[in-house]
Design a protein with these regions (language model features):
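Short, basic, low-complexity termini and linkers enriched in Ser/Thr/Gly/Pro
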Residues: 19, 27, 36-37
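Polybasic, lysine-rich low-complexity intrinsically disordered segments
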Residues: 12-14, 18, 31, 41
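Structural alpha/beta surface segment adjacent to cysteine/selenocysteine redox centers
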Residues: 62-173
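C-terminal cap of thioredoxin/glutaredoxin-like
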Residues: 45, 49-54, 59-80, 156, ...
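Basic polycationic patches enriched in arginine
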Residues: 5, 25-27
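Intrinsic-disorder-associated, low-complexity terminal segments enriched in Asp/Asn/His/Tyr and depleted
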Residues: 6-7, 21, 38
Length: 266
């Protein structure tokens, strides 16, 4: 599901105070843990971010990820994964929007959503031109690019994986590019000055498929069905759909404030 619905699952209330009577009943010899001092180096908060390249809500949410990285820098680490909401785009939209105007109805829906957010541009004929057959083709190609980073074929500090994800989204939503087509994918890679032969090698070897399969396993294990979805705190907290930046920020600040081994209060 490419969802704009805002949903919180399994998270603690921000700023919740522990009652004094409960504190008084704690055993005298029980240790109370405090946040580490500034001199101590904390491991970054790992955020698993699931999205579909063709999802308008993930397109909208990119600015929030950028702001998180600017605000928290090395205090967070975002792991990008893909959920195939539009794995069979044609049939999905034709079936789900049959009684709501078909592809034209979905196009109107996406444009109405986009008008509410000034930081994005959506082509007026979105989902009406050369419609991508499957987002999975995009995700496979993007994993091939990610492998270039992992193997050091491209400089990891250049963040080409993140840049490529955005380039695919921008090409689709602003230019109606059929990003599921391999020729279009290579054209985008060339614009990013990426080594085409090396990307093809990751696909030909099966390694990119293996990375995509790992995403499928994670989607199943973590029951991810919405794009975008953020999962952190070792799977205990998740934010689904169109979640505002301040909500995401508050959750991260809580995790940074509390030591990793702090026990939950009942």
């Amino acid at each position: 599901m490419c969802s704009g619905r805002y949903n919180l699952a399994g998270q603690k209330k921000i700023g919740q105070q522990k009652s004094s009577d409960l504190l008084s009943r704690r055993r005298d010899d029980e240790k109370i843990s405090f946040p580490p001092s500034h001199s101590q180096k904390m491991e970054p908060i790992r955020i698993s971010y699931f999205s579909d390249v063709l999802c308008v809500w993930a397109y909208i949410a990119q600015i929030r990820l950028d702001e998180l990285k600017t605000t928290f820098q090395d205090k967070i680490a975002i792991d990008y994964h893909f959920v195939p909401v539009f794995g069979n785009a044609h049939e999905k939209l034709e079936k789900n929007w049959r009684d709501k105007g078909g592809l034209k109805g979905y196009s109107d829906h996406v444009q109405n959503v986009a008008r509410k957010f000034e930081h994005i541009i959506v082509h007026p004929d979105i989902w009406m031109g050369a419609i991508p057959s499957s987002s999975m083709s995009c995700h496979l190609f993007l994993h091939a690019i990610h492998l270039l980073e992992i193997k050091g074929i491209v400089e990891p500090s250049e963040k080409v994986f993140e840049k490529a994800i955005w380039a695919f989204r921008e090409a689709f939503f602003t230019k109606l590019a059929n990003v599921s087509d391999r020729t279009v994918q290579f054209a985008i890679a060339e614009e990013l000055n990426l080594p085409i032969a090396a990307i093809q090698a990751q696909i030909d070897s099966g390694e990119a498929y293996a990375q995509l399969s790992k995403d499928f396993d994670l989607v199943k294990d973590l029951t991810v069905s919405v794009s975008p979805t953020l999962i952190f705190n070792e799977g205990r907290q998740r934010l689904n759909g169109n979640v505002g930046y301040r909500v995401i920020e508050a959750n991260i600040r809580e995790l940074l404030h509390n030591p990793p081994d702090e026990q939950s209060w009942c």
